[in-house]
Amino acid sequence: MEFRTVVDVPDPGFRIGPCADLLFVGSCFADSIGCRFQEEKFRVTVNPFGVMYNPASILHTVERLSAQQLSPAVTFLTLGTNHVYRLKETGEIVDNCQKRPQTLFIEEELSVDDCADYLEQTIELLRQMNPDVQVVLTVSPIRYRKYGYHGSQLSKATLLLAADKVCGSNPAVCYFPAYEIVNDELRDYRFYQADMLHPSDQTVEYIWQRLTETWLSEEALVFLKEWAPLKAVLNHKPFHPDSKEYQALMDKTMLKVQELQKKYPNFAL
């Protein structure tokens, strides 16, 4: 008997190669998945100007990045909320209130069309950076207690509808169901951290596995297998780092690292 529903992960129509250039922008969930790719030596940029929760702030990050020589092969945009804060004095949406008095800001909720428009602008900028970029939209599974749980669900629904609208009109944009995997497939508090809001490390690892088993190229999967034993040695903290045995192990490991660098030009420690 099957006691859980397994969420289908769609084929994106492309594959992520070994040590590919990736960009992650969005909520703290983007940090979690982006850092997981970093561990596996993909060339990753993660929220370079801090965590961005809403589509407008995600656009602001990409606007700043567009002036830099960055050309990601794949960009993940992780949507956290449709709530934004406008500075009363100027009307601009701010990315961070920077602990300024709350009276200086007006909180608003972006509509589905607002969110979709900000995402479309972001995608256009990304295509200027790399015409062949693949864009992945995902909605963070992290709930927002401060909105109330019903309000949090309404916010997520707005983001889901906006993501669906954008994916439907852009062939090179696809959706990864992280929100659905956590809330429909796992749906158990043992998969959350102590605050009962943020996914646990185990959950992040599960989502990473679901993503990589479908979205990585065969070459990238081979690379992960070759890199895994070397990563284990390099991450190990020896009891006797000055011993001849450990030095011999490190010499052998570094030779294998050099072999990987020859095989995969983008690979770097």
Residue ranges with predicted function:
Residues 1-269:
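Extracellular glycan-modifying ectodomains
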